[in-house]
Amino acid sequence: MYKRQVRLSPNIKTIFDGNLFSSPVDVVINKSNEGGEIFPSVVMTAADSHFMIAEAIVKGIASGDAAGHYQTGLEHAMNLWGTAITDDFAGSLMGTLAGTDEEKLEKIATQRWIANYTNGYEAWAIVRDTGYPASAITTSTDNDIRSLSGAMNGAYANRLRYISSAYTSNAANIEAAVARQGADVKATKLWWAKQ
């Protein structure tokens, strides 16, 4: 059994007193290699693994029951948040894996994205890798996503920049990577990204 994220804790209000921002203190962060776990988090859920298996089956990379893995992924995702799947949802258009292969991939990616909403980097990578949900790319006006130091001019960030300490501690490899991948800016398209 995994430990629940602090965001899922029933004590969240008492921990943060209704505020979701605080200055870094030992209650929020640990110095490197000091102390124990403070806020354990989920790295990958059972839902995510079932959605990825369903995707692999639809793409022909694996064999099995894509619809079954999709349904199991939905169940795990909803159970994680304490929500039961109703018969109405289970039989709905979004609750079943039907349609063309592209429509199936869109449904799977969208559900993976929803299931990862507390894991922003993973959700961002899902959109970058699959192009779904398309609305995440075309309708977001969140300045944290869109402006990113003003260099994006309203576009969706294609990649994250290397941290400045990497240039001092690993300059040769960073320069080689930039030569292969393109400029170290958020607008540089990544080889693996669909969008």
What are these regions (language model features)?
Residues 4-195:
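Acidic/polar-rich alpha-helix caps and helix-coil junctions
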Residues 1:
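Active-site loops and adjacent core secondary-structure elements that bind or stabilize anionic groups
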